Every structure is written in C-alpha cells, then in structure tokens.
Amino acid sequence: MGTIADDILGDLHGRILKTLDQLRTDLSAVRTGRASLHLLDNVRVDYYGTPTPLNQVATMSVPEARLIVVKPWEKSMIPPIEKAIREANLGLNPMSDKDLVRVPIPALTEERRKEIVKQVKHKGEEHKIAVRNVRREAKELIEVAEKDGDISGDDAEKALEKMQKETDDGVKKIDEIVAAKEKDVLQV
C-alpha cells in the first residue's frame, strides 16, 4: 500500500485511541458507589480568588471504600474546599475534621444506579459516533487520493478494509469499556 494510505490509516488509528482514552477519562468521573479520587477531578477551589484544581491545594487519599480524605496544605483552605465539593453537584456532603475534610461516599440507590448506567451507555454511544466520524473522514481522504491517482484502486480497497476493521475494533473496545463500567456501577 502507498504511504498516503498508510498515513491516513495511522491517523485513523491514533484518533480512535484518543477517543478510547477520552471515554475512559469521561467514565472515570462517573460515581460507582465506591470512593475514587477521580470523582473530585473537576472540583475547583477558590484559592485566594483563583479557581484552582483541588489536587493543587491538598493531598487526597481513599482510606476506606466509601471515604475520601482531603488534607489541605493550608488549614485556611478547609472551608473553601468544603464549599467547592458541595457546590460541584456530585451529591457529596463533605465534613471538616480538625485539619482535614472527610468526604463520605453515599451508597447509590437502585434507581440512581440505573440512571448512571443510562449515562454510561449514552457516553459510549457518543464515542462510537466519534469513531465512525473519524472513519468517514479517513474514507473520504482515501477516495480523494484514489480519484487523484495518488493510490491505486487495489490499495484503496485494502485501506478501506483495514479502516473498517480498525473501526470495528474501536467500537468493540468501547462496548467492553462501557460493559465494565456498567458492571462496576451495578455492583452493590
């Protein structure tokens, strides 16, 4: 196959991997009923007037399955940290305790678990669409290259077959990631 087709396939592969990474990142912030530091990834604390990521003003740990402990580097940050976690709409109720903030993770109700599973499936569908859009763009590039005479018809056909396999593999991987997250959410 020609280098143009190889370049297009390489780009397709890279973009599919980025989509899979983005899905993993998106799903890591979804509550499962167990404590995870990723739950607080998007929490911004007012640090002397500047919205600052929580992990830049405190040390965080998960000492128990349903508890996150946030230990600020400055004691004066305890009230703003509590406020930021409360206002992040994560359904969490932080409590200050001397020089740290305890964030108990409430158990999820069956109804809430089903709601979260729907969100997880929706995220999976969004990322499948992204993979298919990447394939469509790559297919158009292959067709233009063939039309312009940059690659032969046989090479274009081989590239399209590889492209379809790459896309199918990406979609299958998305299904696996979503299924694993669903299992995690439904596990009591």
Swiss-Prot record:
Primary residence: cytoplasm
Molecular function GO terms recorded: ribosomal large subunit binding
Keyword presence, Ligase: no
Localization of this protein: Cytoplasm
GO biological processes: cytoplasmic translational termination
Family named by the database record: Belongs to the RRF family.
HAMAP family: RRF
Function comment: Responsible for the release of ribosomes from messenger RNA at the termination of protein biosynthesis. May increase the efficiency of translation by recycling ribosomes from one round of translation to another.
Protein name: Ribosome-recycling factor
Protein encoded by which gene: frr
